[in-house]
Amino acid sequence: MILNTGARTDTAQYYSEWLLKRFAEGFVYTRNPLFPNKVTRYELSPDKIDAVLFCSKNYAPILPRLHEITDKYRTYFHYTITAYGRDIEPGVLDIGESMKTLVALSKLVGKQRVAWRYDPVLLTDQYTIERHMDTFAHMAEKLAPYIDRCIFSFVEMYKKLETNMPELVPISEADKERIAEGLGKIARRYGIYLQ
């Protein structure tokens, strides 16, 4: 079984102590979001878990004790760092702090177990294609020696997002092509596998 610790929330950032306790005790209860009365118990013993997948925007809270998991389980880490500031993501670290934390994570677990996520790509009057290219180039130069790959995607426009973020500029197919080509060119310059 592959255990995804970050599918519903940023567990590494907000619930590190809880997560470490679950691994120490060897089980976790999860509630089915579609059927709230259905609760399942999962055994977390290393012989039952093939790999643990982490997805986070901030691994700093768990780094000092991460070895409690990595010493026993195969792991892979997705680290999301984008161009966006607190105007878009209020709880996120600034880019410099996030990059330092990614480097520290990579030094602990090895670059082959760290993917940098630059997603989702969205456009506003402030977050233009040019700004994405500049920010991505800056980050790619610094992060290339510490990552296995970079994963990017485009924001999916759905009704709730359009309501909550009216400042979003729709991304045309031409914009997508331009962004993908630009990110690809930058990634190649720094030897980053981009997917």
Predicted regions and their residues:
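Generic detection of long, well-ordered alpha-helical segments
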Residues: 9-16, 95, 129, 133, ...
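Extended interaction regions within the primary functional domain
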Residues: 9-13, 142-148, 167
